[in-house]
Amino acid sequence: MRLWLHLVLLVATLEGVRSQVQLVESGGDVKKPGDSLRLSCKASGYTFSGYTMYWVRQAPGKGLEWVSRIYDDGSDVSYADTVKGRFTISRDNAKNLLYLQMSNLKPEDTGRYYCAR
């Protein structure tokens, strides 16, 4: 299982190097419980509008946790139960941008957030 995960990550990394895919997250900050925050992810090096996009996160000392998903055309979204009703994923295909609006933040939302395709 662990070897498989490392292999998948290696393949994803090599694909990114070959095609110059870049996903750059921004908007992180220190917040208090109950606050709101919007994260952005700028994509380049591929046809953004052709891919379903994801947000995942990693709490300190923990593994990766899936947060949310949005279809290529924005027609369907889904959320982890832990964030449902508080987080909203959206995208702007004209600007190659992915967003995660986070409201009513909780201590357990602490972590590093990543966008992925």
Swiss-Prot record:
UniProt key word DNA repair: no
Keywords tagged on the record: Adaptive immunity, Disulfide bond, Immunity, Immunoglobulin, Signal
InterPro entries: Ig-like_dom, Ig-like_dom_sf, Ig-like_fold, Ig_V-set, IgHV
Region named Framework-3: 86-117
Keyword Cell wall biogenesis/degradation: no
Region described as Complementarity-determining-1: 50-54
Pfam families the UniProt entry points to: V-set (PF07686)
Residue segments, region Framework-1: 20-49
CDD domains named among the record's database cross-references: IgV_H
Record's signal peptide: 1-19
GO biological process: adaptive immune response
A cellular component annotation (GO) from this entry: extracellular region
Annotated region (Complementarity-determining-2), positions in chain: 69-85
Residue span of region Framework-2: 55-68
Protein name as catalogued: Ig heavy chain V region 3
Organism for this UniProt entry: Carassius auratus (Goldfish)
